[in-house]
Amino acid sequence: MQNLDIRKAYLDFFKSKGHEVVASAPLVPNDATLLFTNAGMVPFKSIFTGEVPRPTPPIRTSCQTCIRAGGKHNDLDNVGYTARHHTFFEMLGNFSFGEYFKKEAIAYAWEFVTEVLKLPKDKLYVTVHESDYEAFEIWSTHIAKERIYRFGDHDNFWQMGDTGPCGPCSEIFYDQGAEHFNTPEDYMGGDGDRFLEIWNLVFMQYERSADGKLSPLPKPSIDTGMGLERVTAILQGKFSNYDSTLFMPLISEVAKLCGKPYVYESGASYRVISDHIRSVTFLLAQGTTFDKEGRGYVLRRILRRAIRHGYLLGIKEPFMYKLVDKVCELMGGHYTYLNDKKAAVKEQIKLEEERFLATIASGLELFESELKNTKEIFSGEAAFKLYDTFGFPLDLTADMLREKGLKVDEARFDELMSEQKARAKAAWKGSGDKSAKGDFKELLEKFGENKFIGYEELKSKSKILALLDEEFKNIDGLDAGKEGWVMFDVTPFYAQSGGQCGDNGKIVGKADVLDTEKFHGLNLSLVKTSAALKVGDEVELEVGSDRAETARHHSATHLLHAALRAVVGTHIAQAGSNVEADRLRFDFSHPKALSGEEISKVENLVNEWIVNGANAKTQVMELEEAKKSGAIALFNEKYADKVRVVSFGDVSKELCGGTHVKNIDEIGSFFITKESGVSAGVRRIEAVCSRAALNLARSFRAELEELKEELKSAEPLNAVKKLKGEIKGLKDKLKNAKNSHALAFLNVNDTKLCVASIDSGDIKTLIDEFKNEHEKAAILLIQVDEEGKISLAAGVKNAPIKAGAWVKFAAQILGGNGGGKDDFATAGGKNALAIEDAIRSSVEYARQALEK
């Protein structure tokens, strides 16, 4: 079985048991307590804790992508040096929210590993909690009692946290053989590799209170997890996950890039790279970006660790981005968004590689120099300098030292890091904007925050208070043809914030204003000069024409929010937005996709409000007063004591610092272009208005005319319907041709024998036709419908074989059962992966019967 087959087999198996198959949730969870989704149950956490109601149906199955590379669950240091640690992995799981419990969960698990995966029963062992007599007794109906081991809380009790849902768990182990693993730790419960855990079944049956007391849950739940990487290696007869088809194609690519063959014993660097490129590719494809903190910093650490291992292999130029194609080839079939994001992911990786490779040589030189003075502990000061100056994450330095049997003074490193953070915090207390690099503190102390006048004025005379280079360092002047940042005493340019893009425009006769952003309370404009600028210059500023279109889209976003609450429900809450001159994007909390009818109602309501018109009203008031007045505020947003409230008649009222139209009739028209999901419980609407909507309508008309021309019809809809009918007819002919080919037969003792799998048609009709055409006939047909249901039927005419026994024999190979009369019988099956085996065995069964 290849990895894709295992993934599909698992999901299909549990779908056949009534589970709803759900897609993998994002790697960045909607959970402030976690850096990344690190287990299959994370997307369902709020269901297990009772924060949200049980879904329908209350049983689910998934193949969840996971990252463990930060926080409590951090496997980064071990990756590459063990057979099974990974930063990125896929977790197969089935979940029951108060529906079935231990009996069914254990039965499903045993059936899947023994009948679908076909793992030898004499290689399997299980563990249960020492107090879980119920699980022990259930398991004893499937496996010999001497193969069931009891362990305590450390091994067989699971809980989310200090309080909340928890319960005993049961693990399934695979014996890799004493002939391969015979260290003192290779026993059940030991740390050796002989007995390998492949599946963990968690029985959430208790609620733990703050005092540690366990109380039975009224509706116990099931949470299971099986690592795809582990089970793939086992099925392929490999003792290391990295030797399986999930990783070897990547390792082979690394070997090509470095020009050195891979040898397992000395191949840690190959394994690190093959693991890390999966994490980096998936995180970037899902929208995480390289950063100096948080998830973005973990992403950077993973990539830089891989780059350093490439350096060890002699690769001293960007190479990780070249591996993205292979990741997409291996995994893009199931995770199709990888293919869509491939080009952007490669570009981001290459840029990050170039940045680090520019400093890695100097950093390694410092490392080697300091190493000469190190006996056992590498100094924290040197480690901090490697981090602060050369971009070496601490765990990368620790990784290099571990290879030499040394350690780093982490305590001193942490002290220096804390001191740096304290200095930054003191300098920027109350700021909360962007990064702390650059000469912002000096500007704040000298000038304070500059004034934004762009609500009232789109043109103004201003004075240049400061000029900064691209690194935000103070400079006296900016030559013609250069880019830099300008601080004006007063500015009409809106700085990017609240989802609205920053203004562009011009310094009349001097420069183009490309963008405007806010840094620690300072409104700074990025400019490209056509004439020299210097500090103290008196200049004329003019906001670009994009501002008007941006304002229309921002006001339309407020109307969209109000319409969603009116049509879909008041539970709708903004989860993010992006407003530009030619489009808007609005993310909102909602558990499912909007229907076509809901989308139309929302769009119609917004346009109705636009036609009717309503004046904009802005007020500055106390935060609590604003909330009491009914103004909508973002739940996670931090507001000042005084806030700006924007309202449009009785239609909309929100806390907002952005720019808007004076009357909503200025928006013109509004059109929703897309509704999609962002993550569990978050939906996204993309839309256009004003000129962008007009341009879209024109493009639709042009496409319609092109379609008419292509179809040679003035009524393209009717032409398409006609084409669909013709295509259906051709498909039917193709299916019939396939069936005709499939029904080729053998001659056995003057009996026409046919055993086949067919794509379409009525099985009974085909069998009757076959029997009518031949004096002596024996036919068995297998068919799988669109939902994966397997149907079998057998027919016999004037031949020494019984249809009932024959079809039952075939069905049992497919994990099902059936029977019937001697001349005609039917059955059902479950395991589509065994169809070829069923056909071969059924032919042999019939041969033996007919040749007697």
Curated annotation (Swiss-Prot):
CDD domains the record matches: AlaRS_core
Isomerase recorded as keyword: no
Top EC category: ligase
This protein's GO CC annotations: cytosol
Gene Ontology terms: biological process: alanyl-tRNA aminoacylation; negative regulation of DNA-templated transcription
Reactions that this protein is recorded to catalyse: tRNA(Ala) + L-alanine + ATP = L-alanyl-tRNA(Ala) + AMP + diphosphate
Record's cofactor remark: Binds 1 zinc ion per subunit.
Family annotation (SMART domains): tRNA_SAD
Cellular localization per UniProt: Cytoplasm
Cofactor (UniProt): Zn(2+)
Primary location: cytoplasm
Binding site for Zn(2+): 554, 558, 656, 660
InterPro entries: aa-tRNA-synth_II/BPL/LPL, Ala-tRNA-lgiase_IIc, Ala-tRNA-ligase_IIc_anticod-bd, Ala-tRNA-synth_IIc_core, Ala-tRNA-synth_IIc_N, Ala-tRNA_ligase, Ala_tRNA_ligase_euk/bac, DHHA1_dom
A molecular function (GO) term: tRNA binding
Keywords: Aminoacyl-tRNA synthetase, ATP-binding, Cytoplasm, Ligase, Metal-binding, Nucleotide-binding, Protein biosynthesis, RNA-binding, tRNA-binding, Zinc
EC number: 6.1.1.7
UniProt comment concerning the protein's domains: Consists of three domains; the N-terminal catalytic domain, the editing domain and the C-terminal C-Ala domain. The editing domain removes incorrectly charged amino acids, while the C-Ala domain, along with tRNA(Ala), serves as a bridge to cooperatively bring together the editing and aminoacylation centers thus stimulating deacylation of misacylated tRNAs.
Function, as annotated: Catalyzes the attachment of alanine to tRNA(Ala) in a two-step reaction: alanine is first activated by ATP to form Ala-AMP and then transferred to the acceptor end of tRNA(Ala). Also edits incorrectly charged Ser-tRNA(Ala) and Gly-tRNA(Ala) via its editing domain.
The family this protein is said to belong to: Belongs to the class-II aminoacyl-tRNA synthetase family.
Entries under HAMAP family matching the protein: Ala_tRNA_synth_B
UniProt name for this protein: Alanine--tRNA ligase
Record organism: Campylobacter concisus (strain 13826)
Taxonomic path: Bacteria, Pseudomonadati, Campylobacterota, Epsilonproteobacteria, Campylobacterales
Gene this chain is encoded by: alaS
